[in-house]
């Protein structure tokens, strides 16, 4: 299995250690970052994988909020990686021709991203720091376009925070991702909190609600906020973190 190469000891800010790493993947080098308690990672700790949005990267503001929040609020380490074509792996801007080209074939894009995450998760579990039975996923927008197919096929994920996506709207109309989500969502069996923006301009409200209905788990809750796609309040992300932490610590 691929070995994690840590980029030094990282930095500490406000009780949270941020430490970057890289792993040689099947197509290129996977670049990532881990947030953990300053004092160290207790043996058998839970772990949360964090997916970023389209055009973002592993240290985007919303990802930092999730990663640092999990550590500060719940003592749970979190990890994010640059998705294919993003961050150190390409740096495509969101909603650009280059971004939509990545999603021209949604199955290829998600297969590549999911292979990356499976490799990263296996490598992290091999450190002996984490409990393989207490792994969660948090990802909204593109973090759900990638996350739903991943959670559907990765039995090591025990709980997920998803949302800001649906099966219809301007974003899914540009690729085959809507059909892919229709096929994969029924395979999601772990507990899910699903968060939508009521006035999302990229995914229709009906398309978001339809995707929630399609999720195969019987343990799911829906949370919505007024506002556009990029206006999810911190309350929403905090609710996602709380849901994940409660399930991983149960």
Regions found by a protein language model. Give the residues of each.
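Short beta-strand element of the alpha/beta-hydrolase
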Residues: 43-53
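The feature captures the conserved acid-bearing segment of alpha/beta-hydrolase catalytic domains
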Residues: 168-224, 230
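Conserved alpha/beta-hydrolase
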Residues: 68-92
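Catalytic active-site module of serine/aspartate enzymes centered on a nucleophile-bearing elbow/loop
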Residues: 226, 234-250
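Alpha/beta-hydrolase fold nucleophile elbow
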Residues: 128-141
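N-terminal cap/lid segment of alpha/beta-hydrolase-fold proteins
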Residues: 1-43
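Alpha/beta-hydrolase active-site loop
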Residues: 97-128
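The serine-hydrolase catalytic nucleophile loop
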Residues: 55-67, 83
């Amino acid at each position: 299995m691929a070995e994690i190469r840590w980029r030094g000891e990282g930095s500490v800010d406000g009780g949270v250690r941020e430490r970057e790493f890289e792993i040689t993947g099947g197509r290129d080098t996977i670049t990532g970052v881990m947030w953990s308690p300053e004092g160290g990672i207790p043996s058998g700790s839970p772990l949360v994988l964090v997916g970023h949005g389209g055009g973002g990267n592993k240290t985007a503001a919303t990802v930092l909020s999730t990663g640092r929040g999990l550590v500060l609020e719940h003592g749970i380490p979190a990890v994010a990686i640059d998705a294919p074509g993003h961050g150190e792996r390409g740096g495509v801007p969101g909603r650009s021709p280059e971004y939509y080209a990545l999603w021209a074939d949604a199955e290829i894009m998600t297969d590549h991203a999911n292979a990356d995450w499976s490799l990263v998760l296996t490598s992290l579990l091999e450190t002996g720091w984490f409990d393989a039975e207490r792994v969660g996923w948090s990802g909204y927008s593109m973090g759900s376009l990638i996350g739903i197919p991943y959670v559907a096929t990765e039995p090591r994920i025990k709980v997920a925070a998803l949302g800001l996506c649906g099966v219809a709207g301007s974003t899914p109309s540009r690729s085959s991702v809507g059909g892919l989500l229709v096929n994969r969502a029924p395979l999601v069996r772990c507990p899910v909190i699903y968060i939508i923006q009521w006035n999302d301009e990229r995914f229709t409200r009906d398309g978001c609600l339809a995707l929630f209905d399609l999720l195969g788990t019987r343990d799911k809750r829906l949370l919505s906020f007024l506002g556009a796609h990029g206006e999810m309040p911190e309350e929403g992300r905090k609710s996602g973190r709380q849901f994940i932490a409660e399930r991983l610590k149960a």
